[in-house]
Amino acid sequence: MDFSLNESQLSYLDTVRKFVKNEITPRILDMEKEHVFPWEIINKAWKTGLINLSIPESVRGYEMDLFTSALVVEGLSYGDTGISTSAMCNDLANVVIGLHGTDEQKNLFLKPFVEKPILASFCLTEPNAGSDNSMMAAFISKREDGKYILNGAKCFITNASYASQFTVLCKTGKPTGNFMACVIVPVEHVTSYDIPDIGNATREISVPAGGKIIIGKPEDKLGQRLSNTASVTFEDVVVFPNHIIGDRRLGFKYIIDVLDYARPMVAAIGLGLAKRAFDLTREYT
């Protein structure tokens, strides 16, 4: 098996290494001390092509293969795993749309990420269920007009305080239902110019379609401090039928595909961190 890198992959590696050296490494300690969300770095990563790697070419995305994506994530993680986690979670939230969404949904939900540096959140984990999907309580119920209502709480959600779109796994019909749906909840777009630093504040979002989302106080974490993590509560959020990905009974299958994408990325984050730790340790030998 040939593990050599092609010219495109070598070019991406060179780009991400220069980005880490010039934009991340000189600033992370001060940013962590000041509890500042790295909007400026996220913006520059977007302009450099180091974020939103999985978005299809049909909507002017990179449609980067899994191995090359892992190389980019590993490279960013060498600089800071919080920043790489925030960047990677955009793909975590959006890859299901690329895999199972219609052309209309790809244009509706993915194209905005190509056009501006916004963030997405992938909402799976719950306070009373962890990541055990069978114990999940968030659910959608169908109204007489054909629209759906989403209610439920999620926790430990990356990018939550700054997200412009939420990908949500929930039960169908009732909290104890046997089927799961994967729904997309877009909200008003948030950029660095809208919320430069949310600090320890909560955030309440009025959903354009109806209902509201309450974002809890950001978690004060031991590590990955430049990655925002918070709880998300959906209260009577209106979901249009075309905001449900694929079959509303097959959400679990779709999310498994997302997790299959995520696992190599998490491994790449660990590898980038290990390489950085090794290099820093060598300085003291």
Language-model features, listed with the residues they occupy:
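Amphipathic, small/basic residue-rich leader segments at the start of a protein or domain
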Residues: M1-A87, E104-L108, P112-E115
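Glycine-rich beta->alpha junctions and the first turn(s) of the following alpha-helix
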Residues: S4-L5, Y78, T202-E204, G210-T285
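Glycine-rich phosphate/pyrophosphate-binding beta-alpha loops
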Residues: Y78, A129, C155-A160, Y261-M265
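N-terminal glycine-rich flavin-associated loop
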Residues: G82-E104, G130, E144
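A short, Trp-centered hydrophobic/proline-enriched beta-strand micro-motif
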Residues: K116-L124
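Short Gly/Pro-enriched turn/cap motifs at secondary-structure boundaries
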Residues: N128-S131, F156-N159, T172-K174, K221-N228
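A structural signal for short hydrophobic beta-strand segments in well-ordered beta-sheet cores
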Residues: A138-S141
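A short core secondary-structure module
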Residues: K147, N151-I213
